[in-house]
Regions:
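Active-site mouth of glycoside hydrolases
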Residues: 10-214, 221-229, 233
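Contiguous, structured surface segment used for ligand recognition
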Residues: 1-4, 10
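Short beta-strand/loop segments at the ligand-binding rim of alpha/beta enzyme cores
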Residues: 173-181, 241-251, 258-259
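FAD-binding beta-loop-beta segment adjacent to the flavin cofactor pocket
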Residues: 235-239
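Short, conserved loop/helix-junction motifs that constitute active-site signature segments
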Residues: 196-197, 240-242
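Aromatic/acidic polysaccharide-binding cleft in carbohydrate-active enzymes
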Residues: 249-271
Length: 271
């Protein structure tokens, strides 16, 4: 009822078209399109609604191809989607349609990670395939009111950059009404690579899956060493850049995650 999501004039936050500020309270339902059937998906989204979650972040594709609980594949002819809608078949994308529209009825946005970073890093989406996939996604979902596009997927922006750029620009060429961001690797921010990209409407970072101050993992931390909760530094760094764009912590530290996920010699909670 408040209109589509836009970036505020000064670039500090997200708001609706009518000026109402938008507070992003996200839930990571990553494998929702693959693992849940219609009834389970509706139940899950309803529970999210009751708890106040207004953005459900999902992996549209976790693999190439992905298969859902109905045994339907996301691709039946590679990245050629011409015949993806088969008569009499409740296909992979029909189920995705259902999830998106069910969320819309509940006042929720779907943060669509177009494809997770792992298959792209393995070379399973070329630049030309990214263009074809982006065109398919944009044409199918440009008129849905509750889409937020996520490029990337737990991956650094300097890995397969050309593929991510091709995916983003092919979507934006068709769909200019939905916001778009880049979901980066833990303890990195999209501002490092894409702040000046015209397709990036707002930045995103992850707090990471380790203790603040734990220095074991990929070894790349674009912030000062600190043993305190320091995810605010990613906000500070991102918003110091020009042009200023809003920034979201797309994955704060999770509850019930192992105590120091990336170091097998560290303690972990097993209770």
């Amino acid at each position: 009822n408040n209109g589509k999501l836009v970036v505020s004039e000064e670039g500090r936050y997200l708001k609706h078209e009518n000026g109402t500020p938008f507070f992003w309270l996200g839930e990571t339902g990553w494998l929702l399109p693959e693992r849940l059937n219609r009834d389970e998906a509706e139940y899950y989204l309803e529970q999210c609604k009751r708890r106040g979650y207004n953005v459900i972040q999902v992996q549209t594709l976790n693999n190439v191809p992905s298969m859902n609980i109905y045994g339907q594949y996301s691709m039946i002819d590679g990245y050629n989607f011409k015949n993806i809608n088969q008569k009499g078949v409740y296909g992979y994308w029909d189920h995705m349609d259902y999830i998106i529209r069910t969320a819309a009825k509940k006042g929720q946005y779907i943060g669509m990670v177009c494809i997770w970073g792992s298959p792209v890093n393995r070379g399973e989406m070329t630049v030309e395939q990214a263009k074809a996939y982006g065109k398919f996604l944009a044409e199918r979902y440009k008129d849905e009111p509750n889409i937020i596009w996520f490029i990337g997927g737990d991956i650094r922006g300097d890995v397969k950059t050309a593929e991510w750029e091709a995916l983003a620009t092919s979507i934006k060429a068709i769909d200019k009404n939905h916001l778009m961001t880049f979901h980066p690797r833990g303890r990195t921010t999209s501002a490092t690579w894409f702040n000046n990209a015209p397709w990036l409407d707002f930045n995103m970072f992850q707090s990471g899956h380790r203790r603040y101050g734990q220095r074991f993992g990929d070894g790349d931390y674009p912030i000062e060493e600190n043993t305190e909760e320091d995810n605010w530094r990613f906000v500070e760094r991102s918003m110091a850049m020009e042009p200023m764009k809003p920034v979201i912590d797309g994955e704060p530290i999770y509850e019930e995650i192992p105590h120091g996920l990336h170091d097998e010699n560290e303690l972990l909670w097993k209770d």
